[in-house]
Each structure stands twice: as C-alpha cells, then as structure tokens.
Amino acid sequence: QVIASVDEQGREQLRTGGRFLDWPTSQNEPAINAGLQALVIMSLEAGEQLEQVLKNDSLSSLCRTTVERMRQAIPDYKQSKQSAALAALAGLAAPEQCNEILSEGGVERYSTFYGYYMLQAKAMAGDYAGAMDDICRYWGGMLDLGATTFWEDFDIAWLKNAARIDELVPAGKVDVHRTYGDYCYKGLRHSFCHGWASGPTAWLTEHVLGVTIVEPGCRVIRIDPHLGDLKWVEGSVPTPYGVVKIRHERRKDGMIKSQIDAPKKVKIIR
C-alpha cells in the first residue's frame, strides 16, 4: 500500500486517513507534504532491509527503486523545523543546511515530539553543543517551571511571567496549565506527563554517553561520546547479558577518559 501511494514523479500521495505530522504543523500543508515524503522514504528504506533479511529479493528491490524515484522529488522542507529535521534524517537535504533552519530563533518553534528528530538532525550536522543547549533551554524550561515529567506541548514563550506548576499561582503570575495549550489539549486538558516528549533521554544516551547498538541483541556496542561543555557524564545501558556501565570524564588536556564496565559477552568498540 505504501509503495502504491507513490506516483510516477516520486511524490507520496498518501490519502488514507488524515495527513498529519504533529499538532503544531497541522495547518502547515507544505510542511506536512515534506515531512510525509521523508517519512515514506525512511519507511521504505527500513522495509528494504527487512526484506533482505527475509530473502524477499523482489520486494527489497521494489522498495529500493521506489526510494530512488522519491529522492528525485525534493519537497519544500524549509517551512518548519519538523520538516527540516525529517529532510535531514531521510537524506533529502544536507544536515548542515537543515541545521540552519533548526537554529533559527533558538528553540522557538520546537515541538515536544519532533524535538527528538530535531536533535538527531543537529547531531548529523555535528552540532552536538547546539543540541545540548536546546535541551537545556526547551526541556529545561519545563523543569524550571516545576515539571517532573515532560509535557504534551510546550512553547518557550510560556516562561514569561509564569508561575511554577508545583505552587499556588501568586497574584500577577500566569497559570501555565490553565492559560496555555492548543487544539485538543487546551487549558487543564493539557497533559503534563507525556512519553512522546521524552526524546532527550534516548538522545543523551546515544550521543552524549555515546552508545550505539551495532549488532542485534546488543552483542556489539560502539561508544563514541560527545560531552560538549560537560566535565563528566555517567550512565548505564541494559543488555540481555547484563548492564553496561559507562563514565566519561574530561581531562585537563581536553581529552576524554572513559571507564566502561561491560559483560563478557558484549564486545565494546571505541
């Protein structure tokens, strides 16, 4: 069905159900079109890999040739940070070029769900420091207001004159929960505990702690940390063979000293 939705010019023509990326872009048709083009490409690339494992050469080839056709139809991905991030991840545009769009206005026009993909695109561009700063400002903004879990939606502008959510609202302060939200989550219906806003947790493990699973079952793990301006970072990753414990420290000469404790059946690549 997905392959059948791609026309001869390589443009996705998904029409079953609503065309949607996230609520903040729901009125931005060019962004939706660009985002769906990127998502279909990534889906078919994953499909090609799966069919190779299943020895289905004909369907694997069909996925590949469809993606090649789609790459000739470059959408207008510059209409939102969501579509710019997806364009980078799908290989439709240079990550450095997309990062220029993602960096405009700092974390203005970020979104809680696609924020993860924005961080991934910035990492592809080598802008780890910028991504970490965005985490501090955007997700840190929620923490500054008393959050203990991340929210369904957040706009950096909400910080202005805002009361914390863990205290009674003082006179003259803005009640963030009652005042903000949009679409189907206006006012007190706005969730303050939303799993899809937790992307930085995975991103920090992958890029700051530096963990990439290389082989199925976690038999081989690559560790390549990016500390930014942090002096140290510490974390752990569960595997079927036990927990991998990792600590990185920045030495005075700027080099990173790593301490890695891994189960014997897990091979570590540095």
Provide a role label for each language-model segment.
Residues 75-77, 101-110, 137-144:
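Solenoid-like repeat scaffolds
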Residues 1-38, 51-89, 93, 145, ...:
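Active-site acid/base region of carbohydrate-active enzymes
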Residues 28-39, 106-110, 123, 196:
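Extracytoplasmic/periplasmic, Sec-exported soluble proteins
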Residues 44, 64, 71, 102, ...:
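Inward-facing hydrophobic residues that define packing positions of alpha-helical scaffold repeats
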Residues 78-83, 109-115:
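Generic helix N-cap/helix-start motif at coil->alpha-helix transitions
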Residues 1, 38-56, 85-95, 116-126, ...:
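Well-ordered alpha-helical scaffold segments within catalytic/enzyme domains
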Residues 65, 133-270:
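Non-catalytic C-terminal accessory modules of carbohydrate-active enzymes
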